[in-house]
């Protein structure tokens, strides 16, 4: 093989790796009610010292643009950051600068599958968009809406490349102008506002090849996509033991999107929140690996306990509230990139317990590709060794036999969990 061929293969290998180079620890810096509290950007500043002390490397901020819904998930004038219910454009820039001073990078919540229009067209349909600038950027019409979104489209756009969305017009992401102007906007969020990366909302709404385009054209420091599909359930209403199809779909999406993006590990969340309810046998797959995405492609998996949708006041798929720390004991000791939720850290009084776990992770160098050796996985007990450095126990069972070597000491513990190092 000549040197050019070797270089080409090396470059291809590098391009398929996630963009972040050092172990990341993500924090979701808002909940479903944050937009209603007034001045969220300014109030979040007060949290920065605690987040820095907990080893947070990236904070996920809410959608920054003008939106019909106060939470930001029905955006319209994408460049208009002064109309956000979370605060002004300058307040956002100041917040990001304050995070940067502590070495914490900021992710914007990118909501681009759909978009709300500014006014009606001649048919009386809301499908005339404005970008929020004095010029014509993102001033789109009905031809920029997916053809099969018949409630809004004029029938001249492309068919939707993903799943439909009923609450607002589905944008035609196969349109080169859409791709160009959305990429320009995201790059503006980086250069003008200071964002470092992205959390992509509802990535099922367009083909993964579209996500690849936006990744290539904006080159974020870190990016994660929300591909939320239901796990499979049995007739008893409980999750099926085998969720390989579910985690396989996440892996396929990541690879189809170019391999440089991560995905929220909804598989691990679904299994874990069932497992902590006396079914810890779920936490090992037939190959002896973790059963979620972290068991097959951990370097591209972002693990979490809850977010603004699953938890908060929406509670669409909440983790058992009395088992949350068992959940954090799992994700903060295991591979993947863990994400900590604002509510748990600040509102639930769990800051110290979570910070102890994150410090153990940091000082032992546990990262997204760490190895896991599962020592026990039964109804009331889960024990695993990570990187041959630390051991974690989850569950009420106290008799561990000889599972924990005598040279390890308890680094932290709580209700039905403990970590040794």
Curated annotation (Swiss-Prot):
EC number: 3.2.1.1
Binding annotation for Ca(2+) 1: 113, 160, 170, 205
Swiss-Prot/TrEMBL catalytic activity: Endohydrolysis of (1->4)-alpha-D-glucosidic linkages in polysaccharides containing three or more (1->4)-alpha-linked D-glucose units
Residues that, per the record, bind substrate: 73-74, 199-204, 228, 230, 255, 289, 308, 314, 393, 420
GO biological process, one term: carbohydrate metabolic process
Residues at which Ca(2+) 3 binds: 149, 168, 170
Subunit composition and interactions: Monomer.
Protein name: Alpha-amylase
Organism for this UniProt entry: Vigna mungo
């Amino acid at each position: 093989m000549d040197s050019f061929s070797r270089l080409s293969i090396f470059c291809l290998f590098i391009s398929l790796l996630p963009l972040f180079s050092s172990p990341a620890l993500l924090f979701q810096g808002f909940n479903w009610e944050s937009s209603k509290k007034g001045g969220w950007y300014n109030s979040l500043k007060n949290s920065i010292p605690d987040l820095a002390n907990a080893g947070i490397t990236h904070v996920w901020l809410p959608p920054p643009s003008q939106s019909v819904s106060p939470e930001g998930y029905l955006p319209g004038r994408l460049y208009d950051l002064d109309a956000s219910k979370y605060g002004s454009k300058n307040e956002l820039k100041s917040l990001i600068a304050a995070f940067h001073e502590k070495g914490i990078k900021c992710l914007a919540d990118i909501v681009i599958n759909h978009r709300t229009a500014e006014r009606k067209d001649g048919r009386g349909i809301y499908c005339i968009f404005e970008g929020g600038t004095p010029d014509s950027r993102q001033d789109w019409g009905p031809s920029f809406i997916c053809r099969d979104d018949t409630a809004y489209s004029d029938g001249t756009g492309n068919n939707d490349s993903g799943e439909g969305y009923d609450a607002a017009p589905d944008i035609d992401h196969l349109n080169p102008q859409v791709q160009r102007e959305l990429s320009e906007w995201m790059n503006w969020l980086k250069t003008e506002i200071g964002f470092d990366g992205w959390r992509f909302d509802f990535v099922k709404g367009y083909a993964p090849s579209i996500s690849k385009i936006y990744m290539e054209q904006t080159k974020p420091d870190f990016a994660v996509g929300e591909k939320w599909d239901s796990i499979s359930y049995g007739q008893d209403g409980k999750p099926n033991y085998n969720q390989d199809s579910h985690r396989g779909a996440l892996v396929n999406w990541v690879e189809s999107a170019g391999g440089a993006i991560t995905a929220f590990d909804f598989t691990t969340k679904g299994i874990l929140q069932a497992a902590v309810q006396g079914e810890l046998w779920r936490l090992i797959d037939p190959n002896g690996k973790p059963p979620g995405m972290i068991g097959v492609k951990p370097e591209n998996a972002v693990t979490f306990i809850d977010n603004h949708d699953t938890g908060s006041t929406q509670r669409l798929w909440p983790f058992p509230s009395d088992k949350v720390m068992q959940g954090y004991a799992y994700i903060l000791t295991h591979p993947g990139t863990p994400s900590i939720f604002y509510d748990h850290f600040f509102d639930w009084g769990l800051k110290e317990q979570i910070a102890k776990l994150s410090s153990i992770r940091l000082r032992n160098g546990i990262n997204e590709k760490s190895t896991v050796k599962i020592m026990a996985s039964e109804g009331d007990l889960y024990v695993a060794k990570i990187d041959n450095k630390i051991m974690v126990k989850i569950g009420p069972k106290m008799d561990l036999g000889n599972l924990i070597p005598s040279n390890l000491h308890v680094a932290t513990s709580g209700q039905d969990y403990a970590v040794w190092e």
